Amino acid sequence: MIAANFPWLSVLVAIPAAGAALLGFVSPLRRAAGRVIALVVSLVELALGVYVAASVFDWSAPASYQVYESHLWIPQIGITWSLGVTSLGLVMILLAIGLVPLVLIAGWDEDDAADRGAYPALVLALQAFMVVIFAAYDLTVFYFAFEAMLVPLYLTIGRYGVGDEAARHKAAMKFLLYSLFGGLVMLGGILYLWAAGSRAVQDVSLFFRMDTLAHILPSAPLVIQMVIFVTFMVAFAIKAPMVPVHTWLPDTAAVARPGTSVLLVGVLDKIGTFGMITLCLQLTPGAASSAKWVMCVLAVISILWGGLSANGQNDIMRLVSYTSVSHFGFMVLGIFIGSQIALVGAMFYMVAHGVSIAAMFLLSGWLSRRGGTQDMREYVGMQRVTPVLAGLWLVSGLASIALSGLSGFVPEYLVLMGTWTVSGPLALFAVLGVVIAALYVLMPYQRVFTGAPGKGKEDLADLNGRERGVMVPLVAAMLVLGIWSAPLVSALTPVASDLGLPTTQVGATAEGSAQ
């Protein structure tokens, strides 16, 4: 039997990192079987992640950090290699490592002849960084992965995107500049934290570990908390993405491969909301409370702005990306409104959105590749030509707009109910976003998929067996999360309770809906 202190999380980091290195530096393998090796590595990673969730993690204590390991790294400045997960971190890791093999299979026949294996290597590198971020128990480890992942992301967008090369490089540079700016501001906050707090502890070798920070920061003066909160929030708001620092996302989604957009929007952008919960709420509760209404108003603006902008798009990939701006607004609203129910809904939303948006990006990308354009005005009547693709796009869209019985319903319900108990006006404005969401899914569906097939599009192929196979687990997840959501709600509720947020009278009702 493997010892209880086995470094499971480090192994979960090492497997995709080793796979990426193998593909990146051994050119014969890269030329011969890059995709096969990457897929095998990703499946091994998924199997190990499922084992950790099923046999190692104790779900009876989901709010505590588990699967913990800590090693001194640079003790002079308080940096350790420390990993550990709560139920939220583990669920996000499972989402990430579950989507990676689907992305690799979905893009199996994409042209990568010039440098075969490089794109899968970048995907594996991203997988390693995602595990580090969601398992980081040291602030500097979190920041290292937060910044390091920009390199493979920049390459997947700029070098391995679609369409015009100049547009790809422009979008990749815009993404990089936004992200670097946020990261540098966050670094300033980390340096300020060291300068202001290192003298408050006797042993600085563990200063940046989460338990140390959780001991000193919540009781720190409000001005110190506000500096940390604001500098971190700049980085997380860009990553989330929130209005007005969201404009990099539609440009990126328009030129990135569908698989890149799946990982970027489905998982990597959740680093923003994950950081808001685990760093901003947990470490700077006073500042988070002081900034509550500002954050909630910005969240509602994101809900409405993202939805209205989505309705004005002709590019189907930009449409899907703007829907995500609106969805992230719901997540941020749930995080900062100050309700335990809403926070559980926001965490659930992170998972549900990751599944539905993955399906929408893949399906929209497959349609664009078949038709040779992302312009929705060039399509009509596709449900007669590609009925499976059309049906799955509609199901995914309905899941994203919270149709009852699908994955988006429970989290959106929890966020709105929690918001209503705190602020009726904000809840009513957020409900407008639900109405707008119905328009940005149903109207494009009517434009693209209904009616008589357009000229030149009558012979487009429907989804093949490989593509349908990719969609099976995504649709299954949408159904399971919509119908049997109680286990995930139960796993995430203690994480919200641990932050000391108030419960509300609608708690029993919300929990009942999840069952």
Description of each model-found segment:
Residues 29-31, 118, 122-125, 129-220, ...:
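Alpha-helical multi-pass transmembrane bundles of energy-transducing inner-membrane proteins
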Residues 243, 356-363, 427-460:
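Predominantly late transmembrane helices and immediately cytosolic-facing juxtamembrane segments
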Residues 10-25, 39-52, 93-108, 126-127, ...:
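Central hydrophobic cores of alpha-helical transmembrane segments in multi-pass inner-membrane proteins
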Residues 1-8, 22-121, 203-215, 498:
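Transmembrane helix-loop-helix hairpins at membrane boundaries of multipass inner-membrane proteins
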